[in-house]
Amino acid sequence: MPYCLYDNTCKVQQTMLDDLSIIIVNYKSEEDIKNLYSRISGVAEFVVVDNSSSSELRQWCSHDDIHYIDSGGNHGYSGGNNMGIRYSLDELNRESVLVLNPDLEINKEDIRELYTIHQSTNYSIISPRILNREGIPVNESPTPEGTLFRSIGLLPALPGKEHNLKPVDHAHGSCMMISESVFEQIGYLNESFFMYYEEIEFCYRARRENINIGQCQVVDAIHNQPVDQTRFESSYQVYLDFRNRFLASNSIFSKSIDRIQYTTLSILISGWMVVRMLFEKKIEYIAPAIFGALHGIQNRTGKPERM
């Protein structure tokens, strides 16, 4: 069972955004969380969900304006964030949440800008432009996949641009500001995925309900994804990416014809990605990709013990 800790005696700065909580999930990323907190503390209350039950992190959180939740195990991106989101909405009575990855670089002013735009538009899910370490955008939109799905009616047309927001089919999972009304309308993140593709599936569900999603063109954030992943870590990611793409069919679409169309297109997209692996000589990822696709079609969910 999750364990929650919060020191109600701490003094919260008056400049905090009272209707917003920042959700961060920890899995062996304590130092990243401390660094992120040092940059943006005081802008909104923090909710840290600990998927690795770190006694060090728990002790550190008790000395600051941070709500600490021990999740009791590794529940992945979706499970951990859902705990934090539910706590923020139900216990803290927040109207919006900001889901952040621990390895994200963003400052207080940018969070305030996101919040101001979020509150003043009819976009219920927004994210900044996400850059890699070299300053190259990694969440450019519209994506070929989203364009393809919209062309055959699996997703509605994108709305018009509003203020500094570019309409997109999905936000980047490392930084998403989401209104409470979204969860009331479509539910929470899909916990059957464990990791990867969950923000895309969540946003596709939102888009199917005509919920607007935007990328803020005046706010940038840097996602410090590791460049030294082991072969196993990369293969694990490939497996989950391919598997969860197919798992998304049942949760996004209620009509069988839509599921068939989505699955057919996903097979074509996956095949194209495997061909790219061949050309790029990434042979070691082909087996995880194929097994991931097969297991997704077979509806195998949750955290895989091995590929």
Curated annotation (Swiss-Prot):
Disruption phenotype: Impaired formation of the tetrasaccharide present at 'Asn-532' of S-layer glycoprotein Csg. No effect on 'Asn-47' and 'Asn-117' glycosylation of S-layer glycoprotein Csg. InterPro entries: Glyco_trans_2-like, Nucleotide-diphossugar_trans. Pathway: Protein modification; protein glycosylation; Cell surface structure biogenesis; S-layer biogenesis. Its EC number is 2.4.1.-. It comes from the Archaea. The keyword Cell wall biogenesis/degradation does not apply. One of its GO terms (molecular function) is glycosyltransferase activity. One of its GO terms (biological process) is S-layer organization. It is an enzyme of class 2 (transferase). It holds the Pfam family Glycos_transf_2. Keywords: Glycosyltransferase, Transferase. The keyword Transferase applies. Hexosyltransferase involved in N-glycan biosynthetic pathway that takes place under low-salt conditions (1.75 M instead of 3.4 M). Participates in the formation of the tetrasaccharide present at 'Asn-532' of S-layer glycoprotein Csg, consisting of a sulfated hexose, 2 hexoses and rhamnose. Involved in the addition of final rhamnose (sugar 4) of the tetrasaccharide on the dolichol phosphate carrier. Belongs to the glycosyltransferase 2 family. This is Low-salt glycan biosynthesis hexosyltransferase Agl10.
